Amino acid sequence: MTRWAVMTPRRDAGRLDSRLRVVLLAVVVLAVAVAVPLVAQTPAQVPVLDGIAAHYRDAARLWRPRLLPIAQQLYMVLASLEFAVSGAIWTLRRDSLDDIAAKFLLKFTLVAFLLAFITSFATWIPPIVNGFAAAGERAIGSSVTVSPSGIIDIGRQTALTVLNTLDVGVMLRNPAMALFGALAALLIAIAYIVIAAELVLALIESYVVLGGGVLFLGFAAFRGTAAFADNLIAYTFGVGVKVFLLYLIVGLGAQIAKSWIPLIQASTFFGPTSPLLEVVGGALIFAILTVRVPGRVAGRLSGHASVGIAHALRALT
């Protein structure tokens, strides 16, 4: 006798559930197989502060070729004005033809040299700043990396290490000391933010000078505006010195600051030998050194420097 299997609703539901599970499992496996390679190929996100400096650096590389024709045209117009003024002075003074020819030749040589200097701006000016930066990197050593986001990371680790000591027991036993610890962590974080901001400003300043400074060299052809070019060259040296000193100070300071984190972890942070105040003081001193020393030294070294373009144009009249 043939037996017919009776399919109940419960058995149908069981089979549907098993099939649904198999389908879902297959979908999950397929999704993981597709997603893992995509995640592996996703590039690492650029840190925020390093990204800001990188954007200005890349933009400055585009500014220079766009501004170079404008600087050259401006230079030619002002050079014509300079020769017109010189010719009027030579005529009014009734100089001899030999004197006029000699001065004209010397002035023409100077103007031609300055035009060649503007045309080859990328050959002369960027190596000044880049050379100072390379010297700073070489001085601090290859094992030390100076970057704004790296400084922020050190500050965050230090501040979080301080905050990790503020457990519930400490807050209940000594609320005032817990408040002091939280304030100390805030001061440490602010100090490192200031250091990173100063480094970002110096880097962006150098990029702006290298990218847009060629325009101010266009004023070098006329005695009344040649001071712009003189000041730009001196300012370029000042920016290079500032970047160099920042690399030295921030590089050494970052190495010192990294040693504070294990010191905090290994000590009784709220005891009589607590290093909390010293760590806060060290972070603030680090910030003050970064803000004051590079700018002051760069100003002293390049503040009164001058190539003498305006003086040379006047002397050859």
Model-found features: residue ranges?
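Long, intrinsically disordered, low-complexity regulatory segments adjacent to structured domains
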Residues: R3-A5, P9-L25, G282-T317
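Alpha-helical transmembrane segments and their helix-start/interface "positive-inside/aromatic belt" motifs
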Residues: D17-A26, L97-A116, G131-F132, D230-K242
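Hydrophobic alpha-helical transmembrane segments
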Residues: L24-A31, L74-A84
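Binding/recognition "hotspot" determinant
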Residues: L38-L81, A88-T91, A133
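Hydrophobic alpha-helical transmembrane segments in multi-pass membrane proteins
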Residues: V77, L81, V111, L115, ...
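Hydrophobic transmembrane alpha-helix segments characteristic of membrane transport
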Residues: E82-F108, V200-A227
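Non-cytosolic segments of integral membrane proteins
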Residues: L115-V209, L248-I309
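Juxtamembrane inter-helical linkers in multi-pass membrane proteins
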Residues: E137-A139, G211-G224, H304-L316
